[in-house]
């Protein structure tokens, strides 16, 4: 554990840097710096030596060359315990640098601006910063390297305890963080420039680099014989399973996380009133809008009480005492998630200590565009996440849907978007009454939806039907008519659309085309 005698500080994000530098100076640490950082530290009353004075070589090329010098990198890479290194450093007048505090030009923030030019992007590619970070991290046995202001206090506390030194264990952890940081930085540059290698801007670059951070180890994966872990993106900007706060309960499992994500993304579709989504095996088994959250939960539960057992329950408003009590008294539940949880509701759920209670914060009315990825053997499928709802709505039957039917059609359409294909959803009065999911034939999904409704004691007559994709034959319409469906919403686009529309007309049904498919696999 060597004492810190000299630190090179050059940061774009100057959060906390003055106070940190003052405490370093208190240990007698000599501070080297450049540009705006040096100016800021001097204005704060600190003694600072310019890097150009340290190297005996001026900054040049509009600041592009500041720290790219043997006296800097020799001072970082020279191994203090290697006699040949020490002799070489002495022969060339290279003095050791014991600490590097650097963060990088804000490339990602720059290219996120809608008017960012290629020239602006290139000028915000840091060269000297990553080079110093990597040199210092490589020689972490002798050099402390900081890239994150959140680590300043940890290092200062350790220096206080050890008389101005930092342990090798801390140095190693900080070095790993540096390589993670520079990998993400280079990945962002590669992704952005890689989309501009031809004419115009490609939607997807030639190579794709992502970085995820391990958030949680797991007992097992989808099945007990599979190992697993949960990784999250950097800087997630909307309410999600990745950012949700767990208030109580057992650790989230692999399946819990996947199912809760499905429930949360589904409930985000509903903002016209209190709503509840119940999910089992990533499929909504009950969705409803109600006068309040208790009413919404009651109605969602009634769709399929059997499937709701051991399910995931999501709400679009603050979980209150009444809804929490109804859940705890009525059923076994794995996860409850809501934007907010009242203190009283939290107390009630605490009676079931294993129930995982999550608070995710309120989401925006419109979700942020993002990529959806699916791993296949030897590759990765990448697409834009399906955030759209429908294209042009077109009534294609002789009969127009009533106002009430249209409200229910749009309700069931939103649910169908989150049901595994082939998906059929029956609904009435802002409530699902039957969900047919994941069948290889669409007509069988329709039959299952009817069976589910009958089993739950719900009246199908007068309900509407949503289908995530077109009907290839008229049998799905005939089947729906037999159980009392009065209106249908579907994308359209089948070779047999005319036959399907004719079937709806024969049964006196209204049919709306959405011009948009929502397969979900």
Swiss-Prot record:
One of its GO terms (molecular function) is phosphoribosylaminoimidazolecarboxamide formyltransferase activity. InterPro entries: AICAR_Tfase_dup_dom_sf, Cytidine_deaminase-like, MGS-like_dom, MGS-like_dom_sf, PurH-like. Its EC number is 2.1.2.3, 3.5.4.10. Transmembrane segments: none annotated. Pfam families: AICARFT_IMPCHas, MGS. It comes from the Bacteria. Pathway: Purine metabolism; IMP biosynthesis via de novo pathway; 5-formamido-1-(5-phospho-D-ribosyl)imidazole-4-carboxamide from 5-amino-1-(5-phospho-D-ribosyl)imidazole-4-carboxamide (10-formyl THF route): step 1/1; Purine metabolism; IMP biosynthesis via de novo pathway; IMP from 5-formamido-1-(5-phospho-D-ribosyl)imidazole-4-carboxamide: step 1/1. Residues 1-147 form the MGS-like domain. GO terms for biological process: 'de novo' IMP biosynthetic process. It catalyses: (6R)-10-formyltetrahydrofolate + 5-amino-1-(5-phospho-beta-D-ribosyl)imidazole-4-carboxamide = 5-formamido-1-(5-phospho-D-ribosyl)imidazole-4-carboxamide + (6S)-5,6,7,8-tetrahydrofolate; IMP + H2O = 5-formamido-1-(5-phospho-D-ribosyl)imidazole-4-carboxamide. GO terms for cellular component: cytosol. Keywords: Hydrolase, Multifunctional enzyme, Purine biosynthesis, Transferase. Belongs to the PurH family. The IMP cyclohydrolase activity resides in the N-terminal region. This is Bifunctional purine biosynthesis protein PurH. It comes from Geotalea daltonii (strain DSM 22248 / JCM 15807 / FRC-32).
């Amino acid at each position: 554990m060597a004492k810190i005698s000299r630190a090179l500080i050059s940061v774009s994000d100057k959060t906390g840097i003055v106070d940190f530098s003052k405490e370093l100076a208190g240990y007698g640490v000599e501070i080297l710096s450049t540009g705006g950082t040096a100016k800021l530290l001097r204005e704060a009353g600190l003694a600072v030596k310019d890097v150009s004075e340290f190297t005996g070589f001026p900054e040049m090329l509009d600041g592009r060359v500041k720290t790219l010098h043997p006296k800097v990198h020799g001072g970082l890479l020279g191994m203090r315990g290697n006699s040949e290194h020490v002799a070489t450093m002495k022969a060339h007048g290279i003095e050791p640098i014991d600490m590097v505090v650097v963060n990088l030009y804000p490339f990602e923030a720059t290219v996120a601006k809608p008017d960012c030019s290629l020239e602006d992007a290139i000028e915000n590619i840091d060269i000297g910063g990553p080079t110093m970070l990597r040199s210092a991290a490589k020689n972490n046995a002798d050099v402390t390297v900081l890239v994150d202001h959140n680590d300043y206090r940890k290092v200062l506390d350790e220096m206080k305890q050890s008389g101005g030194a930092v342990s090798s264990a801390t140095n190693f952890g900080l070095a790993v963080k540096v390589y993670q940081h520079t990998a993400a930085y280079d990945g962002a540059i590669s992704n952005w420039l890689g989309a501009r290698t031809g004419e115009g801007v490609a939607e997807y670059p030639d190579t794709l680099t992502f970085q995820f951070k391990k958030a949680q180890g797991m007992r097992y994966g989808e099945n007990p014989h599979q190992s697993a872990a949960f990784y999250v993106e950097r800087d997630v900007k909307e309410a999600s399973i990745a950012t949700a706060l767990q208030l109580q309960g057992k650790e989230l499992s692999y399946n819990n996380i996947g199912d809760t994500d499905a429930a949360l993304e589904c409930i985000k579709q509903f903002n016209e009133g209190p709503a509840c989504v119940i999910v089992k095996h990533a499929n909504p088994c009950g969705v409803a809008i109600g006068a309040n959250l208790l009413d919404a939960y009651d109605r969602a539960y009634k769709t399929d009480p059997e499937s709701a057992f051991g399910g995931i329950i999501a709400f679009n408003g603050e979980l209150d005492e009444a809804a929490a009590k109804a859940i705890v008294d009525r059923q076994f539940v794995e996860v409850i998630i809501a934007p907010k949880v009242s203190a009283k509701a939290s107390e009630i759920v605490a009676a079931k200590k294993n129930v995982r209670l999550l608070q995710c914060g309120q989401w925006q009315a419109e979700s942020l565009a993002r990529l959806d990825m699916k791993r296949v053997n030897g590759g990765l499928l990448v697409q834009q996440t399906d955030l759209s709802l429908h294209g042009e709505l077109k009534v294609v039957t002789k009969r127009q849907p009533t106002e009430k039917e249209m409200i229910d059609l749009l309700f069931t359409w939103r649910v169908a978007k989150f049901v595994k294909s082939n998906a059929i959803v029956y609904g009435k009065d802002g409530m699902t009454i039957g969900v047919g999911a994941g069948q290889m034939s669409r007509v069988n999904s329709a039959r299952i939806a009817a069976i589910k409704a009958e089993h739950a004691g719900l009246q199908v007559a007068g309900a509407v039907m949503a289908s995530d994709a077109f009907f290839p034959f008229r049998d799905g319409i005939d089947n729906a008519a037999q159980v009392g469906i009065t209106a249908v919403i579907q994308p359209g686009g089948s070779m047999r659309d005319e036959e399907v529309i004719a079937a709806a007309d024969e049964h006196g049904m209204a049919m709306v085309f959405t011009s948009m498919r929502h397969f979900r696999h």
